């Protein structure tokens, strides 16, 4: 009804790829109306060449698990170097997750998922990855006596013969170990989505190439993947949107230019 209403001049949508695709089909009959889609993401966070392990773990944790992972720009995939340093980072992250409290309400970091359906879908996603060959580091489970509260999932997808490139809207982080930085970038781009990405590193020069090579709309350095500003364009490519970034650029496609040629008689 909203898409077809004659007084509606356009529709700006935030939601999943599935919902965006359905709306796009309806709006195809109304090319005169604006359609801006901000959809999901399978967002990569690459950690490379850093000795500041505690700081890196803080950023990883915040990127993946803020709001119980229920933000479109949350990190979904963590790409680490296949080195002792990478394994140390993963071990610290595991400890950080295990230290979360689920009983003391004054010390809760995050709350439940939005609905029973979302909770079941989240756990089914985890089971799907395990079925495809992923290895569990920390397996998510429902917290007893709670309403849709689940523990975070940490899962190793390195070596999976078949990838599962879908957005998982919950507190899950998929870990991939890469042998080289080029391999890390290639894995970061190994997705149909392109919303957010991040690099954590002591080497600022790495970001110069990273930001050019990564296929995403929001690309942060030594910051959480969820950090964004309304003063900048906000949006993604691929299945993450239809090339209509929100934020600062929205003013351009929500208006139209008027061209005039003016002469004296």
Residue ranges and their predicted role:
Residues 7-8, 46, 142, 149-265:
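Conserved C-terminal structural/oligomerization subdomain of aldehyde/semialdehyde dehydrogenase
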Residues 1-2, 59, 128, 253:
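Well-formed, non-transmembrane alpha-helical positions, independent of function
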Residues 1-12:
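A structured beta-alpha segment of the ubiquitous adenosine-cofactor-binding alpha/beta core
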Residues 3-5, 27-29, 36-39, 70-72, ...:
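Solvent-exposed alpha-helices and their adjacent loops that cap or buttress functional pockets
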Residues 10, 18-159, 221, 264:
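ALDH superfamily catalytic-core signature
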């Amino acid at each position: 009804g909203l898409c077809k209403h004659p007084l509606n001049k356009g529709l700006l949508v935030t939601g999943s790829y599935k919902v965006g695709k359905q709306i796009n089909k309806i709006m195809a009959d109304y090319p005169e109306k604006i359609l801006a889609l901000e959809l999901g993401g399978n967002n990569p966070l690459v950690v490379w060449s850093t000795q500041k392990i505690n700081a890196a773990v803080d950023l990883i944790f915040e990127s993946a698990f803020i709001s119980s992972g229920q933000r479109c720009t949350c990190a979904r995939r963590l790409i680490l170097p296949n080195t002792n340093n990478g394994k140390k980072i993963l071990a610290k992250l595991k400890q950080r997750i295990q230290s979360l409290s689920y009983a003391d309400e004054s010390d809760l970091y995050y709350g439940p998922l939005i609905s029973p359906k979302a909770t079941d879908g989240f756990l089914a996603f985890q089971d799907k990855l395990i079925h495809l060959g992923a290895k569990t580091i920390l397996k998510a489970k429902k917290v007893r006596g709670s309403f849709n509260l689940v523990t975070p999932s940490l899962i190793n997808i390195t070596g999976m013969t078949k990838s599962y490139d879908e957005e998982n809207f919950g507190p899950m982080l998929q870990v991939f170990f890469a042998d080289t930085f080029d391999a890390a970038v290639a894995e970061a781009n190994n997705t149909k989505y392109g919303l957010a990405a991040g690099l954590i590193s002591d080497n600022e020069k790495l970001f110069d190439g990273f930001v050019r090579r990564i296929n995403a709309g929001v690309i942060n350095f030594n910051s959480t993947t969820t950090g964004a500003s309304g003063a900048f364009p906000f949006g993604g490519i691929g299945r993450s949107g239809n090339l209509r970034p929100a934020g600062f650029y929205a003013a351009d496609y929500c208006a139209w230019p008027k061209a005039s040629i003016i002469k004296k008689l």
